């Protein structure tokens, strides 16, 4: 009986495996979009990465946007973090997408860099969306 259940589970996992750009992704989760918006009067440096992907360094003008899309992994452990800077001054490194926190909060996750820190917005309105304060 155990062998039959094991074979059925392996078959289901095999059916859920998807091919994309030459890579195999088993049972991927929902497509998620992250956007960072600079609402400051200065240039904002942004460098985002995950364990597997490095999105490189970007400079956002006032009103500038930077974003990307990804699939949340089926283990719900997807994590992206971003470092922020103003000129040569580090403003902080923060978890911009953390599946255990954000998968139920947003599929379109918008982050707004303001004078005092990073504000997070999703489909469900939050009373105080200030997630992270800048380092002083």
Curated annotation (Swiss-Prot):
GO CC, one annotated term: extracellular region
Record InterPro entries: Self-incomp_S1
Species lineage: Eukaryota, Viridiplantae, Streptophyta, Embryophyta, Tracheophyta
GO term, biological process aspect, one: rejection of self pollen
Protein name as annotated: S-protein homolog 6
Pfam families: Self-incomp_S1
Family affiliation: Belongs to the plant self-incompatibility (S1) protein family.
Keywords: Glycoprotein, Secreted, Self-incompatibility, Signal
Intrachain disulfide bonds: none
């Amino acid at each position: 009986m155990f062998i039959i259940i094991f074979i059925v589970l392996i078959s289901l996992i095999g059916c859920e495996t998807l091919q994309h750009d030459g890579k195999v992704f088993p049972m991927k989760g929902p497509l998620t979009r992250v956007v960072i918006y600079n609402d400051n009067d200065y240039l904002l440096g942004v460098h985002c990465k995950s364990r597997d992907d490095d999105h490189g360094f970007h400079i956002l003008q006032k009103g500038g946007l930077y974003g990307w899309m990804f699939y949340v992994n089926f283990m719900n452990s997807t994590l992206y973090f971003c470092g922020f800077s103003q000129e040569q001054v580090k403003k902080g490194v923060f978890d911009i997408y953390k599946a255990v926190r954000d998968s139920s909060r947003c599929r379109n996750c918008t982050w707004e860099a303001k004078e005092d820190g990073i504000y997070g917005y999703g489909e469900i309105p939050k009373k105080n969306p200030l997630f992270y304060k800048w380092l002083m």
